[in-house]
Amino acid sequence: MRARHNHDDERDLWDTYATSVTREIGNPVMNWTQYAGHGPGVELLESPSTVLEIGCGTGRTLAYLAERGVRATGVDMSPVMVEAVRERWGDQVSFHCAEVLAFLRDHGEQYDAVYSIFGAVWFTDPAKLLPLVVKALRPGGSLVFSHPPAIPGAYGPQGMYKGGFAGRAQFTYRYSYTPGKWESLLLRSGFSKAEVRILDAPESGHIGTLIGRAVAG
């Protein structure tokens, strides 16, 4: 059974999250993992001229790329988040407030790279998202994404309540798979190449980071 997303409720959840993280937005940064200074960098995107970040959050990565001459576009479903990042980075980056599937269906623009850092790839049904990403990429363009690896034995859509487990029920879904399953999903969706791996944390026994890269055309 597929997860039953309620985008209105999820928008409220992400607005609550945005309120907590936009009080003080940090400096531009390029970091694929949850550990500062750990892991690969901008080279995963292979020198794009144009990028789209899906689930762009605070926009810090887009600002980093824009400072290096990349035409940067971001989409996020939270109006609170988008208002804050437009105020912070709007002179450098184009931000759109939209649900990612609707945005990709409605916008015909193509990009050299699409990426997600703990963003929409983690929170959106890949059967619906990945074919749309393929269409949004120029031939030879790449999708790069990162998020925590699946908990062993817990695969597919995983429900997640907003913190506290009390009050009005607000929840969303994360999509968790093994690297091999991600590669299969990517190839079945129309990518010509796919490589997904788990990068170990800098400290033994800590949570690693799943990093995927796929090429269109």
Q: Which sequence ranges carry the predicted segments?
A:
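Conserved class I S-adenosyl-L-methionine
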Residues: 1-47, 60, 144-173
